[in-house]
Protein backbone atom coordinates (compact mmCIF):
# COMPACT_ATOMS: atom_id res chain seq x y z
CA UNK A 1 0.00 0.00 0.00
CA UNK A 2 1.25 3.46 -0.90
CA UNK A 3 -0.19 6.46 0.91
CA UNK A 4 -2.19 9.18 -0.78
CA UNK A 5 -0.15 12.39 -0.83
CA UNK A 6 -2.04 15.29 0.72
CA UNK A 7 -1.20 18.15 -1.64
CA UNK A 8 -0.98 21.34 0.40
CA UNK A 9 -0.31 23.43 -2.69
CA UNK A 10 -3.48 22.24 -4.42
CA UNK A 11 -5.62 22.75 -1.32
CA UNK A 12 -4.10 26.20 -0.84
CA UNK A 13 -4.95 27.20 -4.41
CA UNK A 14 -8.53 26.08 -3.87
CA UNK A 15 -8.93 28.03 -0.63
CA UNK A 16 -7.13 31.11 -1.95
CA UNK A 17 -9.47 31.28 -4.93
CA UNK A 18 -12.40 31.67 -2.54
CA UNK A 19 -10.40 34.15 -0.44
CA UNK A 20 -9.69 36.31 -3.49
CA UNK A 21 -13.42 36.54 -4.17
CA UNK A 22 -14.10 37.57 -0.57
CA UNK A 23 -11.30 40.15 -0.75
CA UNK A 24 -12.72 41.59 -3.97
CA UNK A 25 -16.18 41.89 -2.41
CA UNK A 26 -14.79 43.66 0.66
CA UNK A 27 -12.66 45.98 -1.46
CA UNK A 28 -15.69 46.93 -3.54
CA UNK A 29 -17.37 48.04 -0.31
CA UNK A 30 -14.34 50.13 0.66
CA UNK A 31 -12.76 47.61 3.03
CA UNK A 32 -9.71 46.17 1.28
CA UNK A 33 -8.13 43.62 3.65
CA UNK A 34 -4.77 44.84 4.91
CA UNK A 35 -1.93 42.85 6.49
CA UNK A 36 1.13 44.51 8.04
CA UNK A 37 4.28 42.40 8.36
CA UNK A 38 7.26 43.51 10.44
CA UNK A 39 10.69 41.97 9.86
CA UNK A 40 13.50 42.77 12.28
CA UNK A 41 17.00 41.64 11.35
CA UNK A 42 18.53 39.87 8.38
CA UNK A 43 17.73 36.20 9.02
CA UNK A 44 17.63 34.60 5.53
CA UNK A 45 14.88 32.10 6.36
CA UNK A 46 12.69 34.83 7.87
CA UNK A 47 13.19 36.96 4.77
CA UNK A 48 11.94 34.09 2.58
CA UNK A 49 8.91 33.48 4.80
CA UNK A 50 8.02 37.17 4.74
CA UNK A 51 8.42 37.38 0.98
CA UNK A 52 6.04 34.45 0.53
CA UNK A 53 3.45 36.07 2.79
CA UNK A 54 3.63 39.39 0.96
CA UNK A 55 3.34 37.64 -2.40
CA UNK A 56 0.30 35.68 -1.19
CA UNK A 57 -1.39 38.94 -0.21
CA UNK A 58 -0.64 40.55 -3.56
CA UNK A 59 -1.86 37.52 -5.51
CA UNK A 60 -5.19 37.37 -3.69
CA UNK A 61 -6.31 40.98 -3.44
CA UNK A 62 -5.06 41.87 0.04
CA UNK A 63 -3.09 45.04 0.70
CA UNK A 64 0.27 44.33 2.30
CA UNK A 65 2.47 46.64 4.36
CA UNK A 66 6.05 45.46 4.86
CA UNK A 67 8.21 47.18 7.47
CA UNK A 68 11.85 46.04 7.57
CA UNK A 69 14.26 47.06 10.32
CA UNK A 70 17.85 46.28 11.20
CA UNK A 71 18.63 43.93 14.09
CA UNK A 72 19.60 46.83 16.38
CA UNK A 73 16.05 48.20 16.45
CA UNK A 74 15.12 48.81 20.08
CA UNK A 75 12.20 47.05 21.72
CA UNK A 76 10.64 50.42 22.54
CA UNK A 77 10.79 51.49 18.89
CA UNK A 78 9.22 48.22 17.77
CA UNK A 79 6.40 48.60 20.28
CA UNK A 80 5.80 52.14 19.01
CA UNK A 81 5.43 50.86 15.46
CA UNK A 82 2.98 48.19 16.60
CA UNK A 83 0.94 50.83 18.43
CA UNK A 84 0.78 52.90 15.24
CA UNK A 85 -0.38 49.91 13.21
CA UNK A 86 -2.96 49.07 15.89
CA UNK A 87 -4.43 52.53 15.31
CA UNK A 88 -4.39 52.29 11.50
CA UNK A 89 -7.91 51.46 10.24
CA UNK A 90 -6.48 50.24 6.93
CA UNK A 91 -4.51 47.49 8.68
CA UNK A 92 -6.63 44.54 9.78
CA UNK A 93 -3.88 42.10 10.70
CA UNK A 94 -0.39 42.51 12.17
CA UNK A 95 2.33 39.89 12.02
CA UNK A 96 5.79 40.26 13.56
CA UNK A 97 8.08 37.66 12.00
CA UNK A 98 9.82 35.42 14.52
CA UNK A 99 12.50 34.90 15.71
CA UNK A 100 13.37 38.37 16.99
CA UNK A 101 16.83 39.60 18.07
CA UNK A 102 17.72 38.49 21.59
CA UNK A 103 17.26 41.94 23.15
CA UNK A 104 13.57 41.97 22.20
CA UNK A 105 11.04 40.04 24.31
CA UNK A 106 8.76 38.14 21.89
CA UNK A 107 6.01 37.85 24.51
CA UNK A 108 5.92 41.63 25.01
CA UNK A 109 5.73 42.09 21.27
CA UNK A 110 2.95 39.55 20.76
CA UNK A 111 0.88 41.02 23.58
CA UNK A 112 1.31 44.53 22.15
CA UNK A 113 -0.67 43.59 19.04
CA UNK A 114 -4.36 44.52 19.29
CA UNK A 115 -6.48 41.42 19.88
CA UNK A 116 -8.60 42.32 16.84
CA UNK A 117 -5.46 42.21 14.65
CA UNK A 118 -3.67 39.18 16.15
CA UNK A 119 -3.93 37.15 12.94
CA UNK A 120 -1.03 34.90 13.97
CA UNK A 121 -3.18 33.74 16.90
CA UNK A 122 -0.30 33.67 19.39
CA UNK A 123 -1.47 36.10 22.07
CA UNK A 124 -2.58 34.99 25.52
CA UNK A 125 -6.11 36.12 24.67
CA UNK A 126 -6.18 34.05 21.47
CA UNK A 127 -4.76 31.04 23.31
CA UNK A 128 -7.39 31.42 26.02
CA UNK A 129 -10.19 31.65 23.46
CA UNK A 130 -8.96 28.44 21.83
CA UNK A 131 -8.79 26.69 25.21
CA UNK A 132 -12.32 27.83 26.07
CA UNK A 133 -13.70 26.88 22.66
CA UNK A 134 -14.61 30.47 21.84
CA UNK A 135 -14.37 32.27 18.51
CA UNK A 136 -10.97 33.76 17.82
CA UNK A 137 -7.92 33.60 15.60
CA UNK A 138 -6.43 30.12 15.39
CA UNK A 139 -2.64 29.75 15.09
CA UNK A 140 -1.99 29.41 11.37
CA UNK A 141 0.08 26.22 11.26
CA UNK A 142 -2.21 23.98 13.36
CA UNK A 143 -5.22 25.57 11.65
CA UNK A 144 -3.73 24.57 8.31
CA UNK A 145 -2.99 21.07 9.60
CA UNK A 146 -6.66 20.64 10.49
CA UNK A 147 -7.68 21.62 6.97
CA UNK A 148 -5.23 19.08 5.55
CA UNK A 149 -6.64 16.34 7.79
CA UNK A 150 -10.21 17.29 6.86
CA UNK A 151 -9.30 17.16 3.15
CA UNK A 152 -8.74 13.40 3.40
CA UNK A 153 -12.47 12.91 3.97
CA UNK A 154 -11.73 10.67 6.93
CA UNK A 155 -13.57 11.09 10.21
CA UNK A 156 -11.71 12.85 13.02
CA UNK A 157 -14.27 12.28 15.77
CA UNK A 158 -13.49 9.18 17.77
CA UNK A 159 -10.05 8.74 16.21
CA UNK A 160 -6.83 8.58 18.21
CA UNK A 161 -4.49 11.46 17.35
CA UNK A 162 -0.88 11.59 18.54
CA UNK A 163 1.04 14.85 18.37
CA UNK A 164 4.81 14.72 18.64
CA UNK A 165 5.94 18.11 19.96
CA UNK A 166 4.45 20.39 22.63
CA UNK A 167 5.38 23.86 21.36
CA UNK A 168 3.17 26.87 22.00
CA UNK A 169 2.96 27.52 18.26
CA UNK A 170 2.06 24.03 17.01
CA UNK A 171 1.84 21.16 19.49
CA UNK A 172 -0.41 22.61 22.18
CA UNK A 173 -2.89 24.41 19.90
CA UNK A 174 -2.95 21.36 17.61
CA UNK A 175 -4.06 19.25 20.56
CA UNK A 176 -6.86 21.68 21.37
CA UNK A 177 -8.10 21.83 17.77
CA UNK A 178 -8.19 18.05 17.55
CA UNK A 179 -10.02 17.86 20.88
CA UNK A 180 -12.60 20.31 19.54
CA UNK A 181 -13.07 17.91 16.62
CA UNK A 182 -13.73 15.12 19.16
CA UNK A 183 -10.52 13.18 18.61
CA UNK A 184 -8.84 11.39 21.50
CA UNK A 185 -5.50 13.16 21.80
CA UNK A 186 -2.10 12.09 23.12
CA UNK A 187 0.58 14.79 23.30
CA UNK A 188 4.15 13.44 23.24
CA UNK A 189 7.42 15.28 23.79
CA UNK A 190 11.13 14.88 24.51
CA UNK A 191 10.50 13.19 27.85
CA UNK A 192 8.00 10.65 26.49
CA UNK A 193 9.41 7.11 26.84
CA UNK A 194 9.01 4.71 23.90
CA UNK A 195 7.57 7.23 21.47
CA UNK A 196 6.87 4.52 18.90
CA UNK A 197 4.52 2.76 21.31
CA UNK A 198 2.24 5.80 21.19
CA UNK A 199 2.53 6.65 17.50
CA UNK A 200 1.80 3.06 16.46
CA UNK A 201 -1.64 3.39 18.09
CA UNK A 202 -2.49 6.61 16.26
CA UNK A 203 -5.02 7.03 13.49
CA UNK A 204 -3.61 10.55 13.04
CA UNK A 205 0.02 11.54 13.68
CA UNK A 206 1.26 15.13 13.66
CA UNK A 207 5.06 15.40 13.77
CA UNK A 208 6.34 18.82 14.88
CA UNK A 209 9.70 18.62 16.63
CA UNK A 210 12.25 19.82 14.08
CA UNK A 211 14.24 16.57 13.89
CA UNK A 212 14.86 15.26 10.41
CA UNK A 213 13.07 11.97 9.62
CA UNK A 214 12.54 11.10 13.28
CA UNK A 215 9.20 9.40 12.53
CA UNK A 216 10.03 6.11 10.84
CA UNK A 217 7.84 3.53 9.10
CA UNK A 218 8.07 1.20 12.11
CA UNK A 219 6.42 3.90 14.24
CA UNK A 220 3.31 4.30 12.07
CA UNK A 221 0.04 2.38 12.12
CA UNK A 222 -1.01 1.07 8.69
CA UNK A 223 -3.49 3.45 7.07
CA UNK A 224 -2.79 6.36 9.42
CA UNK A 225 -2.97 10.03 8.43
CA UNK A 226 0.53 11.53 8.86
CA UNK A 227 0.98 15.31 8.95
CA UNK A 228 4.60 16.51 8.77
CA UNK A 229 5.13 19.99 10.20
CA UNK A 230 8.93 19.77 10.32
CA UNK A 231 11.21 21.76 8.02
CA UNK A 232 14.84 20.66 8.19
CA UNK A 233 17.67 21.59 5.82
CA UNK A 234 19.97 18.73 4.87
CA UNK A 235 23.69 18.88 4.14
CA UNK A 236 22.96 19.09 0.40
CA UNK A 237 20.72 22.11 0.98
CA UNK A 238 17.48 20.27 0.29
CA UNK A 239 14.55 20.33 2.71
CA UNK A 240 13.09 17.35 4.53
CA UNK A 241 10.49 16.95 7.23
CA UNK A 242 10.29 15.21 10.59
CA UNK A 243 8.89 12.13 8.80
CA UNK A 244 10.88 9.60 6.79
CA UNK A 245 8.59 10.29 3.83
CA UNK A 246 9.76 7.65 1.34
CA UNK A 247 9.38 4.79 3.83
CA UNK A 248 6.40 6.02 5.83
CA UNK A 249 4.34 6.48 2.66
CA UNK A 250 4.54 2.71 2.19
CA UNK A 251 2.63 2.26 5.47
CA UNK A 252 0.43 5.31 5.98
CA UNK A 253 -2.90 5.95 4.31
CA UNK A 254 -2.35 9.69 3.80
CA UNK A 255 0.79 11.78 4.19
CA UNK A 256 1.91 15.38 3.63
CA UNK A 257 5.15 16.06 1.75
CA UNK A 258 7.90 18.52 2.65
CA UNK A 259 7.94 20.92 0.95
CA UNK A 260 4.44 21.34 -0.45
CA UNK A 261 2.37 20.18 2.49
CA UNK A 262 1.91 22.21 5.67
CA UNK A 263 3.94 25.26 4.55
CA UNK A 264 1.55 26.61 1.91
CA UNK A 265 -1.40 26.01 4.22
CA UNK A 266 0.18 28.05 7.02
CA UNK A 267 0.26 31.10 4.76
CA UNK A 268 -3.24 30.41 3.48
CA UNK A 269 -4.65 30.34 7.00
CA UNK A 270 -2.89 33.65 7.70
CA UNK A 271 -4.92 35.07 4.82
CA UNK A 272 -8.07 33.42 6.23
CA UNK A 273 -7.49 35.06 9.62
CA UNK A 274 -6.81 38.44 7.99
CA UNK A 275 -10.02 38.13 5.99
CA UNK A 276 -11.91 37.27 9.18
CA UNK A 277 -10.45 40.34 10.91
CA UNK A 278 -11.46 42.54 7.97
CA UNK A 279 -15.02 41.23 7.91
CA UNK A 280 -15.36 41.86 11.64
CA UNK A 281 -14.02 45.39 11.20
CA UNK A 282 -16.40 46.07 8.31
CA UNK A 283 -19.34 44.83 10.37
CA UNK A 284 -18.38 47.03 13.35
CA UNK A 285 -16.96 50.27 11.90
From Swiss-Prot:
Pathway: One-carbon metabolism; tetrahydrofolate interconversion. InterPro entries: Aminoacid_DH-like_N_sf, NAD(P)-bd_dom_sf, THF_DH/CycHdrlase, THF_DH/CycHdrlase_cat_dom, THF_DH/CycHdrlase_CS, THF_DH/CycHdrlase_NAD-bd_dom. It catalyses: (6R)-5,10-methylene-5,6,7,8-tetrahydrofolate + NADP(+) = (6R)-5,10-methenyltetrahydrofolate + NADPH; (6R)-5,10-methenyltetrahydrofolate + H2O = (6R)-10-formyltetrahydrofolate + H(+). Transmembrane segments: none annotated. One of its GO terms (cellular component) is cytosol. Its EC number is 1.5.1.5, 3.5.4.9. Keywords: Amino-acid biosynthesis, Histidine biosynthesis, Hydrolase, Methionine biosynthesis, Multifunctional enzyme, NADP, One-carbon metabolism, Oxidoreductase, Purine biosynthesis. GO terms for biological process: L-histidine biosynthetic process; methionine biosynthetic process; purine nucleotide biosynthetic process; tetrahydrofolate interconversion. One of its GO terms (molecular function) is methylenetetrahydrofolate dehydrogenase (NADP+) activity. NADP(+) binds at residues 165-167, 190, 231. Catalyzes the oxidation of 5,10-methylenetetrahydrofolate to 5,10-methenyltetrahydrofolate and then the hydrolysis of 5,10-methenyltetrahydrofolate to 10-formyltetrahydrofolate. Belongs to the tetrahydrofolate dehydrogenase/cyclohydrolase family. Homodimer. This is Bifunctional protein FolD. It comes from Verminephrobacter eiseniae (strain EF01-2). The lineage of its organism: Bacteria, Pseudomonadati, Pseudomonadota, Betaproteobacteria, Burkholderiales. The gene is folD.
Amino acid sequence: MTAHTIDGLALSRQLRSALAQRAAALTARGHQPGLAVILVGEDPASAIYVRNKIRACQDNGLRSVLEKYTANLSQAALLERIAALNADPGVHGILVQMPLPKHIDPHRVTEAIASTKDVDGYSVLSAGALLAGLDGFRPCTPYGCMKLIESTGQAIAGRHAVIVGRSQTVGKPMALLLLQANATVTLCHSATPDLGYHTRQADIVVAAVGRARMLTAEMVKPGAIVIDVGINRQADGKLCGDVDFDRVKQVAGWITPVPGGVGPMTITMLLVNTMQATERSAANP
